[in-house]
Amino acid sequence: MVNPYNQDLDANSANYQPLTPLSFLERAADVFPEFTAIVHGNLRRSYAEFYLRSKKLASALSQQGMTRGSTISTLLLNTPPMLEAHYGIPMCGGVIHAINTRLDAATIAFQLDHADSQFLLYDRELSAIVKEVLSQCKVKPQLIEFIDKEHSYESLDNFDLDVIDYEEFLDRGDSNYQWLMPENEWDAISVGYTSGTTGDPKGVVSHHRGAYLLAQGNAMVASMPKHSVYLWTLPMFHCNGWCFPWTMSAIIGTHVCLRQVRAEPIWNSIKNHKVSHLCGAPIVMSVILSQDQKNRFNITHEVQFFTAAAPPPENILREMQESGFLVTHLYGLTETYGPAVINEWHQEWNSLDMNAQASLKARQGVRYLPLEHLKVLDPDTMKQVPADGKTIGEVMFQGNIVMKGYLKNKSANQKAFEGGWFHSGDLAVMHPDGYLQLKDRSKDIIISGGENISSIEIEEVFLKNDCVSAAAVIAIPDQKWGEVPCAFIELKKDQNWNEIHAKQWCEENLASFKVPKYYFFENIPRTSTGKIQKFVLREKGKSLTGTN
C-alpha cells in the first residue's frame, strides 16, 4: 500500500531549509538590533554590529578564496573576534577550527597540517607560540592578528611574518555580503581535536544540524530566558564553547567576555552585568571561591554554574551554594558537541544532607534534551548492563548531537560507530533511577582543570629519555584541579635520575598543564602478559599522595 502522506508532498525551498545556528544571529539583529550582544571591558557591541562584523569577516575570507570546505583556524582567547569567528567563518562556507591556546607548538602544528588550515586568526599575546608553530608545520596559513585594545600587552613588536591586522581585514569585507547557507544541514561547521590518547589527535567534525540542536537544547536545559547574561569562563575553544556562542544569539542574550579566569573580574562581572549563567571545570569554582570574603558581595539574583569533567568536591559544592550559585553537573565529549548528559536535580533532593547531595551530584546524570539515546552497554554483547549501580559497561550514544565523524580517519570512524552506536570509551554504571555515573576511562584520560590530558602522551615523553626504561601515568584526585597526572617511572640500570630531573624533562617537552604533579621511582606492576596494571597504580598513588 502506498502511503498517501508521502505522495506529491516532496520537500522544496518553501517548506525545507537546512538547520544552522547562523540563522540565530540574523534573527537577533533583525528583531533586537540595538540590544547589547557583547561586553568586553569598556567595549559594547549591539546585535546589529555583531551581525555586520560577522558578515564582513565572511566576505573578507570569501574574497581570499575561502568557501565551502575551507578550514580557518583560530588561536584566540575569549574575546569578541572569537565570537565573530563562530559566525563569520561558517557564513562563507568555511569550517572553524578553534585551537586550544594552552597546547604546545608541535601539537598545534599537527592540527594545522591535518586540517589543511588556510587562515589562522590569533591574539597578539600568542604571537611567540605562533612563530614556533609556523616553523614546524607544513601548511602556511595566512595570518590575521588581533590586537585587543582592552588589554595591555607586554610587547607589541612584530615578528618577521606576513601578518594582517584583524580590524584592517574586516574593513576589506562587504557589509552587504550575502552569506552562504549550508547546502545540507549535515555540512561541517567545525572541526575540533581530541587530546590524542592513542597516537595523534583526531579531528572531530561537527555539522550545522547538531550545532543548531545543541544550541537550542542549552537554552532549554539551562532554563535561559530571553536576554540572559553569559560570562565566558569556559574557553570557547572547548567544543566551540559547548555551542553557547550560538545559544546566546537564539535567546538574544549578552556575552560578557573574559580574557583570563580570575576571581575579581568574575565577581565584578556578576555584580556589574548581572551575569545569570557561566560554565567551566571545577577549577573555575575554586577560582571563584578564592576571592576574599571581604571582597565578595551577596548575590541577589540567580546565577547558574554548569560544570563538567571530574565531579566537584563536596566542600566546593557547599561553598558555591552558600555563595549564591546553583551548580549543575554535566558530562559530554568533543564528539557530542560538548554536554550530552545532565544531572537533572529533583526538588526533593534539597531536603537531604550535604553528604547525600554531594553523592547525587557526583553522578553524571541522564541524556541531554537534544540527545536521542543514552545507554550503558556491554561492548562485547552490545546489551544493556543491569541498572544496579554496580555493573560496569561502556557509555554509548545515538542522536543528532553525535559528531559527523573523525576527519580523514576511516578506521577510527568504523570503530567509533560499530553496532550503530557511538562508543565513548568511558566506563560507567547505571543506577536504578536511570542516572549514570562514570567509573573509569578506558582511554586513560586525565581531566585536569577541564583539560583532557592523555596519559599515553606523557608516558611517551618519559620513554624518550635514555634514563627511563618504563613509565606509567595515572590520574590522582586534586582539590584544586579535579585531577592531576601522577607518574610512576622505572629507570634503567645504574641511572641517577630524580624528581627534579623528571619534572624538568616534562617541562621541556610538554604543555605546562600536562606536567605531572607527582613522581615515584619504582618497579611498575604488570600482568603475566606484560601489561601495566594501572588499577594497582591508582590505589598505590592515592596511598602515596594521601588522596582519595
Question: What do these predicted ranges mean?
Answer:
Residues 212-229, 237-277, 290-293:
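Conserved AMP-binding/adenylation subdomain of ANL enzymes
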Residues 63-64, 91-168, 492-495:
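Structural core segment of the AMP-binding/adenylate-forming
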Residues 103, 110, 120-122, 278, ...:
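AMP-binding/adenylate-forming catalytic core of the ANL superfamily
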